[in-house]
Amino acid sequence: MKKSTLLMAAALLASTFNAHSEYYWTNISAGDATTYAIRNDGTLWTCGWNEKGQLGVPSVKERTATFSTVGTDKNWKFVEGGKAYGFLIKEDGTLWAVGTNTDGVQGTGDGIDHKTPKQVGTDTDWAYVTSVRFWGYTALAIKTDGTLWGWGSNSSNQLGTGNTGKNETTPIQIGTDNNWKTVSMGVAHTMAIKTDGTLWGWGNNSSGQLGNGTQTSVTTPVQIGTDTDWSYVKAIDNRTYAVKTDGTLYVCGSNAYGLLGLNQSEEELISNYNTLTLASNFTEKVISVSGCENTTTFAVGENGIISKIYTVGDNTDGALGDGNGKLLTATSSSDEMPRSYTLVEPLLPEGLNYSVLSSGQNYSLAITTDGKLYAWGRNKGGQLGDDTDVDMLPTSIYKKPVLIPCPQTEIDASVNTVLSDNTVRFNGSTLYTTEPIQNVSIYSLSGALLKKANTVEQTWTVDNLEKGIYLLQYTLDGKPNTMKIVKK
């Protein structure tokens, strides 16, 4: 036994300390209160709330501020966080869903929640997916052939099928066009751009968010204006942000709290815009927009590189990142929260450039061009990934951006750090198990037995171990298992 353990330890030691570049983040998406991130080795990591299993890590009971890897696959390409659900695309073009399946939002057709990623159908040509995110249970996706597909709730015609109120539990093609380029969803409306540069919209239009000059809702895609130079569009809540090829920003819909970014004072504020209106106060080219129902973040720069970030709106739980936020408690009111009707800048370090900006419910995440992650705002579910203890999370906020380290744990698929079904997981200090495991032992890499238990149910802390790499051996369902763990 000891000899085999020593041999395995030697092999693991070699693989662990193989020369490799420092791990860094390449993509990230803020859901309602759950964060999905991809590391440069293609592994998927999550943190935040897990009430519907949306982390893809069943061992997390409710929430966590520690990034955990979802399985050991190293071919994740794209992530999209929603309202207690997430969508994921792999390099092979397969689409996966995790979390709640309310209204058929996962597109899996089985009507059940999934606590680990579940493949959506068998197609291998998915290119992009978006969702209603914080407000409901609808998703739309574009395939590599340019066709548009949707599923989930269609309560406000946000799917664009024309079948008002008819939910779809599996992907259904929207029309027959095959030249869709990008698509984005608000609370109940959808905006999209075709490869010919035309802008389209459908669904709810009660705030003028479609930008067609009316407040009349539509059931299927309609072209917005006649321009053919649109390059980017973002739908957020009841408002829309569209960018032309020259980087100019046009906005429409609800302008509560100045969320359209027009830099109007509270006294000057116009509540709604029914047509796309130029945001002439932006002197830099706008690259992307993100936000929630009461906050908007704008990314500006050149050639896809973000050089500056602006925020506007409500500053609950530090959402604006300017240092002036306030904690929302059970006894306080949203009316007491500070807000800015004009653009402010989060207190990010000077001189940095960014590749990704994503905002969730009162929190934001920005990845620098060299893969570092800065985060600010609400952290009550651990969605910022800062390793805050669970007991401290109910009051955890960051009024200004903080650097969130990327986990450096080596993920080796040949010796699982997590069983494929997520039965057993180690978060750096505690072993979690969804089923009882027996004959549990922890060995040093030299083969010395350091800790032992006959049976472990749910949790087993190893705080007495020094920081380092160890071997965990245990029996599950009569079968022996070995996994590498890293004590933080």
Language-model regions, residue ranges each:
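Sec-dependent, cleavable N-terminal signal peptides
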Residues: 1-22
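An edge-strand/N-cap motif at the start of beta-rich repeat modules
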Residues: 19-52, 67, 72, 375
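Conserved core positions of repeat-based scaffolds
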Residues: 28, 34-37, 46, 85-88, ...
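Short loop/turn segments immediately following the C-termini of beta-strands
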Residues: 33, 40, 49-51, 84, ...
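Short glycine/serine- and acidic-residue-enriched loop/turn motifs that recur at repeat junctions
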Residues: 47-66, 98-118, 152-169, 202-220, ...
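Thr-biased low-complexity repeat/linker tracts and other Thr-enriched repetitive architectures
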Residues: 92-95, 143-148, 170-176, 194-199, ...
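Blade-level signature of beta-propeller repeat domains, shared across WD40, Kelch, NHL, RCC1
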Residues: 358-409
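C-terminal outer-membrane/trafficking sorting elements
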Residues: 415-488
